[in-house]
A protein has these predicted regions:
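Gram-negative bacterial Sec-dependent N-terminal signal peptides
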Residues: 1-21
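A conserved helix-loop-strand patch within extracytoplasmic ligand-binding domains
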Residues: 94-141
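C-terminal functional modules
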Residues: 240-279
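Short helix-initiation/N-cap motifs at beta->coil->alpha
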Residues: 32-33, 55-67, 161-172
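A bilobed periplasmic-binding-protein/Venus flytrap-type ligand-binding module shared by bacterial periplasmic
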Residues: 107-117, 212-225
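Ligand-binding cleft/hinge of the Venus flytrap
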Residues: 42-51, 128-161, 266
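Extracytoplasmic "Venus flytrap"
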Residues: 24-40, 60-61
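A ligand-binding cleft/hinge motif common to bilobed small-molecule-binding domains
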Residues: 78-91, 175-200
Length: 279
């Protein structure tokens, strides 16, 4: 059975000896669309296909990196490397095990609806007043938050970044689009909003925003302690279309993301079977 907690409540807790494998897999994730989707999908696979118990924990990325490096969490499936999360990797990378890339070509940047008459970051000052001089961002611990502050400086933008959360940011985007109003947000692909709205990532001629791969990282000793789970993670890859399909299904549903992920797993069983280690 999946348990969901906040990280502050469980730091320092030991691994529980329960379930078929007498082990609980502890996965930490941020409140980001792709992280929610991938983490709940892996929880479904581990529990329903492989017999493990899973404990899910939400936290900011800096807290997650610290907890995984310290061994308080087993896995983090949403590490944007080598660029967006570079400061965290510089601090904790030597203590983490790399379990491969789930998807490549992970794009970050400033995003606007296609009805807006700007195509590049260096054009934003021309509509700064229409935007109330604001860029709608996410949490201050996110790599894209730091990159956006750098973009404001590099492009000398007459804008300030307003921190919020992934859900709050997409809610603001949806409200603006419904009213055909101008808005600029910090965005990334893959994300369900690109499947729902007509959006464009603004050109970045100064190259402030990097392209990354989304990696899975584990605590020290994880591959030795849980080799079957480590092999699952090494095998786990998704196309942008597959991940977008899962993210949209979760966002469209009032059900728990874990239940939606389970339904997606059953509808894509051949794909899931290709990830599961076979003896």
């Amino acid at each position: 059975m999946t348990k969901t907690k906040t990280l502050s409540a469980i730091l320092g807790a030991g691994i529980l000896a329960v379930g078929v494998h007498a082990q609980t897999v502890k996965i930490a994730y941020p409140n980001w669309a792709e992280g929610i989707a991938m983490t709940n999908l892996m929880a479904a696979v581990l529990e329903e296909e492989m017999g493990y118990d899973v404990e899910l924990t939400t936290a900011d990325p800096g807290v997650i990196y610290s907890a995984v490096a310290a061994g308080d969490q087993d896995l983090f499936l949403d590490a944007w490397l080598p660029n967006t999360h570079e400061p965290y990797w510089d601090e904790y990378g030597d203590q983490l095990e790399n379990l491969g890339t789930t998807f490549g070509n992970a794009i970050t940047g400033l995003v606007v609806p296609t009805y807006m008459q700007v195509d590049s970051i260096d054009q934003l000052n021309s509509i700064a007043s229409d935007l109330d001089n604001k860029i709608i961002g996410i949490g201050t611990g996110a790599g894209i938050y730091r990159a956006t502050n750098a973009a404001i400086n590099e492009y000398d933008l007459e804008l300030v970044q307003v921190s919020s959360s992934g859900p709050a940011m997409t809610a603001a985007l949806g409200d603006a689009i419904e009213n055909n109003e101008p808005i600029v947000i910090t965005g990334w692909k893959p994300h369900w909003m690109f499947g729902r709205y007509d959006l464009k990532v603004l050109d970045d001629p100064l190259g402030v925003y990097p392209i990354d791969g989304c990696r899975k990282v584990a605590r020290p000793g994880f591959q030795q302690d849980m080799p079957e789970v480590a092999e699952l993670m090494l095998n786990f890859t998704m196309t942008e279309e597959q991940l977008l399909d899962l993210m949209i299904a979760i966002d469209d549903s009032d059900a728990d993301p874990r239940d939606v992920a389970s339904d997606w797993m059953r509808s894509n069983q051949p794909v899931v079977d290709s990830w599961i280690p076979r003896s």
